[in-house]
């Protein structure tokens, strides 16, 4: 019998294969649709401070979303790795300050103002897949799980 970790790993492989099979055009349309729907939710409209991941590789291109958050006058914070397995929200006012950090993921400089978790109204996190009940399947590193668990 497979362990839960083995089942999750197998599911991640299947989902990754699907993502890799997408054409560039399909990916662009999918990215736009996700961003369109996110920015039309009541949660987004009400949010004053938004924590959002910076997509890379197989993940959606979140740069248009990050630009929209700033254009809408919202306070933006993105992941900032502050230690092994520890991630906080670093405030960003200008996307040009983002530089490759841990694992090559663009993040703000270490001296960026840290946003208190209590101030974050909406979190937009990567998701490899989700259950019908809304349980998120991440990429396996646990950074976002640990971050979200502290809310």
Predicted regions and their residues:
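Generic detector of intrinsically disordered, low-complexity, polar/charged segments
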Residues: 82, 101, 126, 135-139
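Membrane-associated lipid acylation/remodeling enzymes share a hydrophobic transmembrane-juxtamembrane segment
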Residues: 133-151
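Well-ordered alpha/beta subsegment
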Residues: 114-120, 125, 129-134
């Amino acid at each position: 019998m497979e362990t839960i970790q083995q089942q999750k790993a197998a599911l991640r492989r299947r989902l990754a294969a699907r993502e890799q099979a997408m054409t560039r055009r399909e990916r662009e349309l999918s990215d736009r649709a996700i961003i369109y729907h996110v920015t039309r939710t009541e949660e987004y409209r009400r949010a004053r401070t938004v924590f959002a991941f910076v997509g890379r590789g197989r993940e959606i291109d979140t740069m248009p979303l990050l630009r929209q958050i700033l254009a809408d006058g919202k306070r933006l914070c993105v992941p900032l790795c502050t230690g092994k397995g520890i991630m906080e929200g670093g405030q960003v006012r200008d996307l040009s300050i983002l530089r490759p950090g841990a694992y090559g993921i663009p993040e703000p400089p270490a001296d960026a103002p840290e946003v208190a978790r209590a101030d974050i109204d909406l979190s937009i996190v990567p998701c490899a897949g989700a259950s019908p009940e809304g349980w998120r399947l991440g990429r396996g590193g646990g950074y976002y799980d640990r971050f979200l668990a502290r809310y």
